[in-house]
Amino acid sequence: MNTELKLISMRDIQTEDVQWLWYPYLPRGKLTIVQGDPGEGKTTFVLAVISALTRGEPLPECEQAPEPVNVIYQTAEDGLADTIKPRLEAAGADCARVLVIDESKRELNLSDERLEQALRKTGAQLMVLDPIQAYLGDGVDMHRANEVRPILKRTAAMAERTGCAVILIGHMNKAQGLKSGYRGLGSIDFRAAARSVLVVGRLKDDPAVRIVAQDKNSLAPEGKSIAFQLDGERGFKWKGTCDLSVDDVLSGSGKLQTKTLQMEEELERMLREAATAEAVLNRAKELGVSERTLMTAKKNLGIVSEKRGSQWYWMLPEQGDVYKRQHWHWPCCG
């Protein structure tokens, strides 16, 4: 079959700036891969991102709060009613903005026209497919580049047409000693098609803390690694940025140091007894901690604010409970 030759002059191409849903981790209109070993917190991390985006709250390293967005979330591993919705609610997501394509009569795959239909109908700015291998389609060998490449090319084209950021969640293979680029499950074409690749892992010294490290960024300088914690009592908590590398994450080695953790330790020391909000703010400035990081540390520790006379005081939650019992007539303000 003969195809008419058509040439495009680069002179006629109108340049465009890359648009970001979360700079520099999640570009609009492009594919992003989030990968890690099973049980390391990939889905938990993505659900936390969804929670912030649906509420219009800034993510780590973002200076301004974005407008709330709709999200399409497809999962083949977890139940919607008993797992995904409870986790979204625990993360504080606006569940009215999280939409799922009904697969009860026909399963989805990346070549399914319903994906783009859903994006156009809802105006969703993010689509998540978890895990990627479940959406390749029947008979597709994820290790064969000639089978994977055309599927990813179509998915990337859909993302570009709609301007939607697409996250593909995947597992790592079990091979040790390989470069991070070759630890992804399946063909290397998955990595090649993605403009951003994020790796999630935990540290051996503190298994409750997970690290998200950017392993690839084709559109901007690679972002800082981000720490988060899965706390049995307080749930998901962002713990700030750090200098740990992808290799540190994959090996579980390295010492975690972030401004958020530093401020949490300082607050626990300062607030053995209640301290004025002014004193806390001054101490944060001395340590070079931003007000936003300070507020994150305050939220993570559950610190309460009480007004005594004309001054505001900060105290740890257990101190706040005692204080309210003793001075019930003073108002409690957040």
Residue ranges and their predicted role:
Residues 45, 49:
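Hydrophobic positions on the alpha1 helix immediately C-terminal to the Walker A/P-loop
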Residues 26, 73, 84, 130, ...:
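Conserved RecA-like P-loop NTPase ATPase core
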Residues 5-7, 120-123, 161-162, 203-334:
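C-terminal regions of RecA-like/P-loop NTPase motor modules
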Residues 1-12:
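A short, basic N-terminal segment
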Residues 33-34, 39, 44, 71-74, ...:
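Phosphate-binding/switch region of NTP-binding enzymes
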